[in-house]
């Protein structure tokens, strides 16, 4: 039998504070602050990288790739670090043809991207709805 969560997902998302100006060192520092200042113990469990984390185009295999200038060790490195601190790692994607900031999104790549996120150790996905006027959320879900 499924149980309801005791709280909504609580944590830190980069967008409202940093927008597109995100990088690996920042994510490690945010993770440390969540632990050192007691947020983790108060129930805040998620560290979420929002939009603008990827390259502007997918690689030759059609996969999303973290921007190596911003994230030189890649997303699995960050996920492993977040997990080592007893927190959960979240990432951003979008249902449209592009993310809200114009980066590659998961439209028509949902399965491939889900496998990629899983291989990186992603626990949570923030899924936006930009650049998808052709279909309704209900239609896309079906």
Predicted regions and their residues:
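Metal-dependent phosphate/diphosphate-handling catalytic cores characterized by acidic Asp/Glu clusters
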Residues: 4-5, 26-27, 73
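Second-shell loop/turn segments in exported
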Residues: 15-22, 66-68
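An acidic-aromatic substrate-binding cleft motif
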Residues: 1-19
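Short N-terminal amphipathic alpha-helix/helix-capping patch enriched in small hydrophobics
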Residues: 8, 23, 27-30
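Residue-level detector of secondary-structure boundary/capping sites
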Residues: 3, 25, 135-138
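Short linear motifs at secondary-structure transitions and domain/linker junctions
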Residues: 22-24, 100-101
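Aromatic-lined carbohydrate-binding/catalytic grooves of carbohydrate-active enzymes
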Residues: 29-134, 140
């Amino acid at each position: 039998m499924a149980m309801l969560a005791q709280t909504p997902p609580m944590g830190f998302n980069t967008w409202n504070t940093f927008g597109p100006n995100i990088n690996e060192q920042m994510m490690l520092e945010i993770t440390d602050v969540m632990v050192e200042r007691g947020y983790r113990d108060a129930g805040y469990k998620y560290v979420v990288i929002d939009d603008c984390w990827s390259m502007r185009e997918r690689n030759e295999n059609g996969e999303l790739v973290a921007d190596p200038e911003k994230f030189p060790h890649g997303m699995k490195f960050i996920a492993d670090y977040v997990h080592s601190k007893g927190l959960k790692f979240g990432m951003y994607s979008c249902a449209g043809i592009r993310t809200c900031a114009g980066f590659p999104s998961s439209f028509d790549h949902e399965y491939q991207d889900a496998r990629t996120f899983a291989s990186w150790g992603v626990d949570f996905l923030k899924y936006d709805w930009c650049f998808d006027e052709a279909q309704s959320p209900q239609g896309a879900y079906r």
